[in-house]
Design a protein with these regions (language model features):
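General beta-strand structural signal in soluble alpha/beta enzymes
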Residues: 11-13, 61-64, 87, 110-111, ...
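Conserved beta-loop-alpha segment that forms the PLP phosphate-binding cup at the N-terminus of a helix
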Residues: 57-86, 90, 94-98
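Active-site-proximal loop->helix
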Residues: 96-107
Length: 240
């Protein structure tokens, strides 16, 4: 008998994180049919409780995707080709915002800070003022996994409001571990993932979007399907 079978490994990575035993036990059960009443009941209960995790009164959109999928959904719904978008990065996943914005054709201003340093909200504000026209959104990271730095999301939200633009925050590795009261701070979009501090299996990604962000997405003429927020919100309400 292979002794490796009985070795218990403990993950010390930023994600995926270790699963609580009761979660692992459920994962060993037979797969459920996603249209069955029992599954729908669990799904609806999860959707009902997710806003508490994000500290918001808004619905949380759920996708079968990696965290990067939910990040792409934010860019697909909010960025417009040729229109300004500002990215503030200080690590690998901040850079991903810039790559996404450029892929969708946004006129991207990428403010790159030294890895290991925090994003400077004042410089973000100066960059917005220098654009000469409103930015569609600021894209930033709460907890930069590549360095461990926690950015000042509250200050970035104040900058966004002062310049009448949206703030989109990747909180994939911080959500559930670092406080981020979305509604209280006025953060328009918070992106989350199941496999980090929430300690559940990989495969789910979330976008908690404010009414202002959803309105901006509804007016965006860009093409999208799976990551279309309006379609996803409608599906969650009407046919889970």
């Amino acid at each position: 008998m292979n002794p490796e079978i009985f070795n218990k490994q403990y993950l010390m990575t930023a994600g995926p994180t270790p699963l609580p035993p009761r979660v692992s036990q459920v994962m060993a059960e037979p797969i459920a049919y996603h249209r069955a009443p029992a599954f729908v009941e669990v799904y609806e209960r999860a959707l009902e409780r997710l806003p508490k995790v994000f500290q918001t009164a808004n619905d949380v959109l759920s996708f079968a995707a990696s965290g990067s999928g939910a990040m792409e959904s934010a860019v697909a719904n909010l960025a417009v080709p040729g229109e300004p978008a500002v990215v503030a990065s200080a690590g690998k996943f901040g850079q991903r915002w810039a790559e996404l914005c450029e892929a969708f054709g946004a006129d991207t201003t990428h403010l790159e800070f030294e890895w290991g340093e925090k994003v400077d909200p004042e410089r973000v504000g100066e960059s917005l003022a220098a654009l000469g026209r409103p930015a569609r959104a600021i894209f930033a990271t709460q907890s930069e996994t590549s360095t461990g730095v926690i950015n000042d999301v509250r200050a970035l939200a104040e900058v966004a409001r002062a310049h009448n633009t949206l703030l989109v925050v990747d909180a994939i590795s911080g959500l559930g571990a670092v406080d981020l009261p979305q509604d209280e701070w006025g953060v328009d979009v918070v992106i989350g993932g199941s496999q980090k501090s929430l300690m559940t299996p990989p495969g789910l990604a979330f976008a908690a979007a404010s009414e202002r962000a959803l309105a901006a997405a509804a007016e965006n003429p860009g093409r999208r399907y799976y990551f279309d927020w309006s379609r996803t919100a409608k599906g969650q309400r009407e046919q889970p």
